C-alpha cells in the first residue's frame, strides 16, 4: 500500500490510507464503474406519511443506531486483496473520507469488487461490530436494484 500509517481501529491494528491519489482512485473506481458514492442514501426517515404505507405493505426494516456509517469494499489493488472501510462522511477540512485497510478473510472471489453498506458499532462489552445493512455490489455485479431478500440471502452466503 502507499502513504499512510498504522492505527488502532475497532480495537485492532489497521492501516489508515493517507495517500490522496489512492483515495481518489478508489472512490473513482466505485463511482465510474458502479455508480456508488459515499453520498448515496440507503434509508428513509420514518414519519407519519410513510408509516401508513409500511403498515399496509410487507417490508423488511433495519434501524439506524448511533454507529458510524461505512462501506466495506473488498477489492484487488496491484494484485493484492484489500478490505477497505470507507467512511461515508468527510471530516471538515478534508477532501476525502477516511479509508482504512483491515485484514479480513473472505473467499478470494469476493475480492473481485464487493461492497457492503453498514454501520460500525461498539457494544457494552467494548466489542466492535460491523452491521451489514445492504449489499450494493457483489463480484462486480450491481446489487443496488435487487430486492432486499436477494441481497441479504447473498450476504448470508458470503459470510
Question: Where on the chain are the PLM-derived regions?
Answer:
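Active-site-proximal "nucleotidyltransferase
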Residues: 1-120
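Catalytic nucleotidyltransferase
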Residues: 2-11, 105-159
